[in-house]
Amino acid sequence: MDISISWVAIILVISSYFIFMNKWRAAKLPENLPPSPPKLPVIGHLHLLRGGLPQHVLRGITQKYGAVAHLQLGEVYSVVLSSAESTKQAMKVLDPTFADRFDSIGSQIMWYNNNDMIFSRYNDHWRQIRKICVSELLSPKNVRSFGFIRQDEMARLIRVFESSVGVPINASEEISKMSCAIVCRAAFGSVLKDQGLLADLVKEALGMASGFELADLYPSSWLLNLLCFNKYRLRRMRQRLDDILDGFLEEHRVKKSGEFGGEDIIDVLYRMQKDSENKVPITNSGIKGFIFDVFSAGTETSATTIQWALSELMKNPEKLAKAQAEVREKLKGKTNPDVAEVQEIKYLHSVVKETLRLHPPFPLIPRLCKEECEVTGYTIPAKTRILVNVWSIGRDPAYWKDPDTFNPDRFDEVSRDVIGNDFELIPFGAGRRICPGLHFGLANVEVPLAQLLYHFEWKLPQGMTPADMDMSETPGLSGPRKNPLIMVPTIHNPTS
């Protein structure tokens, strides 16, 4: 009995504390906040996130309360942006104000205390790492120079599918291996020995770095922080990550040269680490954080987009036939096509854009409002977490006819691109924090997809129809398929 009374007392004290803090914070909020659903004591709107993926639930909220909505998730105030107009104002007009990131337990542990580029705060460290990344890895010249790597890895992938003719094969797994190898060879000069384990860690980490952990939403609660079991799971994952990256970096130190016979980006980072004139020191943790960035943003997003493109084409056989017909006409007689040849295939570009519209690599883009400002007439308080619902914008009937339908032909009538200028379609973000690797990523999607459509006829496993396909997504920062894509390849015979 005494124990029960003690627990009740503890719960009452904790609840009273949170209620008091919520009222104190609410009293300091400006009056002209965006619309908000009714909320509960202590948890605010947290209960509304039950029963679905965050991007789906948040779309329902903004459809009811407006494209800009204010939410209290635990202790944390957030604003959801779900329109092209509000997103343009935040990411273009007020870009410096919204260029920051907020912390999460997942990003702090797995991305080395946000000492990377993706999750870094908007500061000199971020500017320095991004500049190195763009100049040494992601310039248009470098993207073109990686053509032979794409050709090598595509040849390997084609051999894998040729050896499985007529047999169901896990296409998701093989495409992920190919994407991983391309990025490793381009960035680091060789394929990592443990790249499979690293790819698995990336998928797991992206699923746990969304910022929706209870400890993320109640940052002042030492008890929830202590009881956050995912934190201990993440620390075990981080130890495995350290073991892999430490081994790779040690091998890198003793090797003489990479695939290109000269410096790769790791060599550049090590050279700059020794430069005493750098305003911001480059630490070993920063180098490891950058490597994990390359994997999480470079391999997972390209592989996921190819898998979704094939999934949508398999679900829409008439679109698949049209895409294959154009690819085979444009690439006829060409061996080892790369970016220059694929650029001529208009319908393929439309397929990729339509895939990115329906399945953006990062459905919710996290930002942090640095100082109080106004967006579409509403006041956004300083330090408010911003969630740009890219997934919802891409399915908004105000911008897209039949928005939930996969229809690449829509781009014959609608001139929109994915490079951050058209805010109805921003799968790579926009503004100064737009994904620096978008051209590299697009090349690593379009070239492999073209070759897979050129060389093979694709069928679903026996007894399965397009209507039976599971198009569910996995929870987390990225939006990969929940279940692997299983297909049956048959070699295309041009003379038949």
Curated annotation (Swiss-Prot):
Entry binding sites for heme: C435
This protein's UniProt keywords: Heme, Iron, Membrane, Metal-binding, Monooxygenase, Oxidoreductase, Signal-anchor, Transmembrane, Transmembrane helix
InterPro entries associated with the record: CYP450_71D, Cyt_P450, Cyt_P450_CS, Cyt_P450_E_grp-I, Cyt_P450_sf
Superkingdom field: Eukaryota
Membrane-traversing stretches: 1-21
Stretches of the chain forming a coiled coil according to its record: none
Main location: membrane
Cofactor(s) required, per the database record: heme
Localization terms from the record: Membrane
First-tier enzyme category under EC: oxidoreductase
Pfam families in the cross-refs: p450 (PF00067)
Gene Ontology, cellular component aspect: membrane
EC number: 1.14.14.-, 1.14.14.51, 1.14.14.53
Induction, per UniProt: Slightly repressed by Spodoptera littoralis, a herbivory insect.
pH dependence: Optimum pH is 6.8-7.
Expressing tissues: Expressed at low levels in flowers, leaves and stems.
Recorded family membership: Belongs to the cytochrome P450 family.
Function per UniProt: Involved in the biosynthesis of phenolic monoterpenes natural products thymol and carvacrol which have a broad range of biological activities acting as antimicrobial compounds, insecticides, antioxidants and pharmaceutical agents. Catalyzes the C2-hydroxylation of gamma-terpinene and alpha-terpinene to produce carvacrol. Also mediates the C6-hydroxylation of (4S)-limonene and (4R)-limonene to form carveol.
Protein's name in the database: Cytochrome P450 71D181
Naturally occurring in which organism (per UniProt): Origanum vulgare
